UniProtKB/Swiss-Prot annotation:
Residues 272-281 have a biased composition (Acidic residues). CDD domains: Ribosomal_L22 (cd00336). One of its GO terms (biological process) is translation. Residues 261-271 have a biased composition (Basic and acidic residues). Belongs to the universal ribosomal protein uL22 family. The globular domain of the protein is located near the polypeptide exit tunnel on the outside of the subunit, while an extended beta-hairpin is found that lines the wall of the exit tunnel in the center of the 70S ribosome. This protein binds specifically to 23S rRNA; its binding is stimulated by other ribosomal proteins, e.g. L4, L17, and L20. It is important during the early stages of 50S assembly. It makes multiple contacts with different domains of the 23S rRNA in the assembled 50S subunit and ribosome. It comes from the Bacteria. PROSITE patterns: RIBOSOMAL_L22 (PS00464). This is Large ribosomal subunit protein uL22. Keywords: Ribonucleoprotein, Ribosomal protein, RNA-binding, rRNA-binding. Residues 159-175, 199-239 have a biased composition (Low complexity). One of its GO terms (cellular component) is cytosolic large ribosomal subunit. InterPro entries: Ribosomal_uL22, Ribosomal_uL22_bac/chlpt-type, Ribosomal_uL22_bac/org-type, Ribosomal_uL22_CS, Ribosomal_uL22_sf.
């Protein structure tokens, strides 16, 4: 974005405003609005560069309208005795209005006709010079946000830094006063200073015996745990061996097979009886 401070000449008089309008353009309003929305609010020189490299076909037409608006603004500034460049102007407004629609038709089969709508549009672009307020706002925006944020943090951090420097200085003074009082009390009463090393020494001498007893107790407990584990491993196979063998019950024969066999035996008996009766006869 081109800054207004780097322009060729800055206006000291009133703000210069100019516009350019293209009427009855054969570009549809929807396609023209896609291009116009991209340059609205941009500086005039940046808007021209953007329109130069846009892939849309409407960008060439909008470029011509913007160039005409810039030329109109330069003429207005010349009347006031000022000089303006594209860097000194900004696209303040840009919009597209819908023009009349030309209705045509396309003949189709069996006497039918399809309607054709040829839409037109009116493209309008307004430009104006940078006012003094806009220049100050632009210079503020030119400063990166990180620098302003760092300045704000450093300004707010000064009281905290002073407090941090004061507190460490106060703590050592209090500590030194307490040590002086303790030393004075120790010099006044000698017995407390003599008794504390003895107590510490007795505690130091007692600790090895206690640690030895604890280690012995721990070793005995580990030995007991090992013996119990061995006993459990030995008793487990014996218990498995003592278990009696489980006999599975024999599978019962199905009732259907038994019935079939009974029927067959009855049939054999009836045949034998019939043969016996025939022999006797």
């Amino acid at each position: 974005m081109a800054s207004p401070m780097g322009s060729t000449a800055s206006l000291t008089g009133p703000v210069v405003r100019a516009r350019a309008r293209l009427r009855y353009s054969t570009i549809t309003p929807m396609k023209a609005r896609r291009v116009v929305d991209l340059v609205r609010g941009l500086p005039a020189d940046e808007a021209l560069t953007t329109l130069q490299f846009l892939p849309q076909a409407a960008s060439a037409t909008v470029y011509k309208v913007l160039a005409s608006a810039i030329a109109n603004a330069q003429q207005e500034a010349a009347k006031q005795g000022e000089r303006l460049d594209a860097e000194d102007l900004v696209v303040s407004a840009a919009y597209v209005d819908e023009g009349p629609t030309l209705k045509r038709f396309r003949p189709r089969a069996q006497g039918r006709a399809y309607r054709i709508r040829k839409r037109t549009s009116h493209i309008t672009i307004h430009v104006e010079s940078w006012p003094a307020e806009a220049e100050t706002r632009a210079t503020k925006k030119a400063v990166p946000k990180g620098a302003r944020h760092r300045r704000r943090l450093t300004g707010a951090g000064k009281p905290a830094a002073s407090a941090a420097t004061e507190t460490p200085a106060a703590q050592p003074v209090a500590a030194t006063t307490e040590t002086v009082e303790v030393e004075a009390a120790a010099t006044a009463g000698a017995p407390p200073t003599v008794e504390t090393p003895v107590a510490v020494a007795s505690a130091a001498t007692e600790t090895p015996a206690a640690t030895a007893a604890e280690t012995k107790a721990g070793g005995a407990a580990e030995a007991e745990v090992a013996t119990t584990d061995e006993q459990t491993t030995e008793t487990a196979p014996a218990a498995e061996a003592e278990k009696p063998a489980v006999r599975r019950p024999a599978a019962r024969k199905s009732t259907t097979s038994a019935r079939r066999r009974a029927a067959e035996t009855e049939g054999h008996d009836s045949d034998a009886e019939s043969t016996d009766e025939g022999g006797t006869r």
